[in-house]
């Protein structure tokens, strides 16, 4: 194992990430710095994509806010991501749910995994 892999495994071991995948509804607590104070901001939505690359892993969360679709890409092991909570498990048959971008209302619903 080279030095880069060793450092990445050390950084990854310091954070516990719950098991989640595409279709799951998650709440991501993100650190936001405003001036000299820092607070946590919650971003709740459906995971539409997940990229598993060790320390460089990322996932995309989509939500509809005031009738406008909002997507945000989070680096899984970023120090800005404080916590990830899984609200509900979605039953989907795709790894990437980009088709949800074109759907609205009831058509964008995802069945819950039993």
Swiss-Prot record:
Gene3D superfamilies named in the record: 2.30.30.790
Top-rank lineage group of the source organism: Bacteria
Keywords assigned by UniProt, alphabetized: Ribonucleoprotein, Ribosomal protein
One Gene Ontology term from the biological process aspect of the record: translation
GO terms for cellular component: cytosolic large ribosomal subunit
InterPro entries: Ribosomal_bL19 (IPR001857), Ribosomal_bL19_CS (IPR018257), Ribosomal_bL19_sf (IPR038657), Translation_prot_SH3-like_sf (IPR008991)
UniProt keyword annotation of Transmembrane present: no
Transmembrane feature ranges: none
GO MF assignments: structural constituent of ribosome
PROSITE patterns to which the protein is assigned, alphabetical: RIBOSOMAL_L19 (PS01015)
UniProt similarity note: Belongs to the bacterial ribosomal protein bL19 family.
HAMAP family hit by this protein: Ribosomal_bL19
Function: This protein is located at the 30S-50S ribosomal subunit interface and may play a role in the structure and function of the aminoacyl-tRNA binding site.
Protein name per the record: Large ribosomal subunit protein bL19
Lineage of producing organism: Bacteria, Pseudomonadati, Pseudomonadota, Gammaproteobacteria, Methylococcales
